[in-house]
Amino acid sequence: PRAVDRTQYALASGFAEILSTQLAIHELEVQKELTARAEVRALQAQINPHFLFNTLNTIASFTRTDPLRARELLREFSSFYRATLDNSGSLIPVSREVAQTKRYLTFEKARFGEDRVLATFDVSEDIEDTLVPAFVIQPIVENAVRHGMGDGDALRIDVSVHRDGEDAILIAVADNGVGMDEGTAARLFDERSARPDANSPQGGGAGVAMHNISERIHRFYGPHSYTRVESAPGKGTKVLLHLDLSESIFDIQE
């Protein structure tokens, strides 16, 4: 009987150890997701008053020259910030992130001129409902507008989102702007280069947002995911985001 008791005790102890390990792993995963959601909420809370002023000033100028256009912009502006606040989860469908990026461009086109900022979006239909972190495309497009626009030709921005193999997606944002040297491109996602910017919709600025994108992608999607910048002075810039969905810390349901 004692041998049986010892065997039962050993089995129970082993089971308890396994259960404790599983609970610890689960708790770690929960904490990772809570951290991810907190980071998104922090971005949402950073609504910059200067961007608010500049956009409302643009709308006000249209009230004198084109009241109908002013009304449309005001309605779109309301939708933009409502969507920003509504994206309370860490993950949103690709289609929603693209829609929010288009709203952002609406204000930049109104500010600089419809013929000065041109954009195309090429998104595979089969991944429109794929869940991605909020604020991964719009800040990159914002950075292209801020730093890519020159004094001559219109700025063209091409956004594409496609599958990259069976379990990954590739987000590409390319522009024909002024470009940047190798050192500047290497620092684009660097924490040390993240500086507040008064013209950014998110108060931390595009630099902070760009660094945040890189941090979240590597943290959420593992070592096989990456952020890459291809650029040269006078040759435009392309930003690539590779998201390995198979290594996501989230339980993604498509």
Set out the residue ranges of the language-model regions.
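C-terminal end segment of the histidine kinase catalytic
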Residues: V229-E254
